[in-house]
Amino acid sequence: MGLLSILRKLKSAPDQEVRILLLGLDNAGKTTLLKQLASEDISHITPTQGFNIKSVQSQGFKLNVWDIGGQRKIRPYWRNYFENTDVLIYVIDSADRKRFEETGQELAELLDEEKLSGVPVLIFANKQDLLTAAPASEIAEGLNLHTIRDRVWQIQSCSALTGQGVQDGMNWVCKNVNAKKK
């Protein structure tokens, strides 16, 4: 097989499919983030009652992103979506300091889930465009992220509204999609 035919085969190889679970409290910005990734209009977003799924092509991957509603009454159903998750993206509203404890508890519970064991996690410290937003470093410290040892993780400041930091986070996802620790 010549070099040209090898290159043709590589070029025509289908993108690796990746299942991404997008979670976080209600009003954290998950759906805005998903629409930003899909280059869709973000001017009119309503609370997600069930879930949204979008597929996005990125760096040789077909990212199937599952955006699950974050309202308290929906959270018990999150576990129905854990199976076969390749990457967990957890979105935090950096400007809503009153809910840091609640979001920290939810994240800790997710990290303890057996079906998500070893799954790489990206934490988006969202709404950095707001003056009241806590920096990602402060959130990481407050949530004791440095104690996470059973998986690769990253905290990324972003604004789903402006798009700032979103691509940096997704670059990390694509680099670490195969880093699931057994």
Curated annotation (Swiss-Prot):
GO terms for cellular component: centrosome; cilium; cytoplasm; cytoplasmic microtubule; Golgi apparatus; Golgi membrane; microtubule cytoskeleton; midbody. Its main location: Golgi. GO terms for molecular function: GDP binding; GTP binding; GTPase activity; microtubule binding. Keywords: Cell cycle, Cell division, Cell projection, Cytoplasm, Cytoskeleton, Golgi apparatus, GTP-binding, Lipoprotein, Membrane, Myristate, Nucleotide-binding, Nucleus, Protein transport, Transport. GO terms for biological process: cilium assembly; kidney development; mitotic cytokinesis; photoreceptor cell development; protein transport; small GTPase-mediated signal transduction. GTP binds at residues 24-31, 67-71, 126-129. PROSITE patterns: ARF. It is found in: Golgi apparatus membrane; Cytoplasm, Cytoskeleton, Spindle; Nucleus; Cytoplasm, Cytoskeleton, Microtubule organizing center, Centrosome. InterPro entries: ARL2/3 (IPR044612), P-loop_NTPase (IPR027417), Small_GTP-bd (IPR005225), Small_GTPase_ARF/SAR (IPR006689). The keyword Transcription does not apply. It comes from the Eukaryota. A lipid is attached at residue 2 (N-myristoyl glycine). It is a peripheral membrane protein. Small GTP-binding protein which cycles between an inactive GDP-bound and an active GTP-bound form, and the rate of cycling is regulated by guanine nucleotide exchange factors (GEF) and GTPase-activating proteins (GAP). Required for normal cytokinesis and cilia signaling. Required for targeting proteins to the ciliary membrane by releasing myristoylated protein from unc119 cargo adapters into the cilium. Belongs to the small GTPase superfamily. Arf family. This is ADP-ribosylation factor-like protein 3. It comes from Xenopus laevis. The lineage of its organism: Eukaryota, Metazoa, Chordata, Craniata, Vertebrata.
